[in-house]
Amino acid sequence: MYDRLQAVEDRYDELNELLSDPDVVSDPKRLRDLSKEQSGITATVETYREYKNVNEQINETKELLGEKLDDEMREMAKEEFAELQKEKTDLEERLKLLLVPKDPNDDKNVILEIRGAAGGDEAALFAGDLFRMYSKYAESRGWKVEIMDANPTGIGGYKEIIAMMNGNDAFSRMKYENGAHRVQRVPETESGGRIHTSTATVAILPEAEEVEIELHDKDIRTDTFASTGAGGQSVNTTMSAVRLTHIPTGIVVSMQDERSQLKNKDKAMKVLRARVYDKFEREAREEYDANRKSAVGTGDRSERIRTYNYPQNRVTDHRIGLTIQKLDQIMEGKLDEIIDALILEDQTSKLEHLNDAN
């Protein structure tokens, strides 16, 4: 572990020199990439330097204890030695976590896609409830939410809704929401009071920048059509809606939320870039995931990850066996208790994998 930490510190010092190099300063892309790399290892280097400093103090205190001291001085040295040993242990644990490979997408913004699945109108209503839950959560964290496209049902639900979430750590926290969400409740239209089960799927995609995934015009087919509202009726006479097809992957994105064809195409391109990036990244991870199944699930959007039971005011996350009797609060966007537990489980699993590899 310490060889790796020393290598990280050496790289940090090298980056410091590079960032003051005129050739780097004059190259915006390289400057941004190196600054991002340095920012990503700063906490590790600072903690490692603190650890080395504590180690030096421990050695000095050991030497002091080997000398002839009066009782009071010896007692003080022993107390200091014990405190330093505890601090060293704490720093070692922090360093282990800091060495866990960071998801390169954690700092990215999020494209959120929610679709009503099994359950008809009730599934669409639940999709709407999930979107409102995530919107409130985003507000609590100071993130901005922008609806990019929506297919409302007319009864307060959505067959599909796509939104952009902009803010610090958005992907690092929202990525655990990928999967199928199940709801158990009595629909408002149910006169007999029977509990129905419906599902909605949630897709969390990191926003991909143009420099990360290049889409060539020759690989994209663009179709335009008239926008439609709930029920399928045409809502305008202009061909403002846009459908983009990425021919190599077959990925299709439609966008009709804006009255402007140009704005719809711009939004569709953002979603298309994110979906293509997500596809390539998933394929690259397949071999790794085959050797190590994540403690918090595979991230497959068909995987049932959570159940929301309204009659019992209960939410259960099936990946980590966590049950919370606070469904009313969860639906108001108070998701940190669940997400923090998922992050801890994920970090613990990665740390165990790291220890096994060593």
UniProtKB/Swiss-Prot annotation:
Pfam family, one: RF-1
Keywords carried by this UniProt record: Cytoplasm, Methylation, Protein biosynthesis
Keyword Protein biosynthesis: yes
PROSITE patterns: RF_PROK_I (PS00745)
Chain positions found as N5-methylglutamine: 233
GO molecular function, one term: translation release factor activity, codon specific
InterPro entries: PCRF, Pep_chain_release_fac_I, Pep_chain_release_fac_I_sf, Prokaryotic/Mito_RF, RF-1
Similarity annotation: Belongs to the prokaryotic/mitochondrial release factor family.
Protein name as catalogued: Peptide chain release factor 1
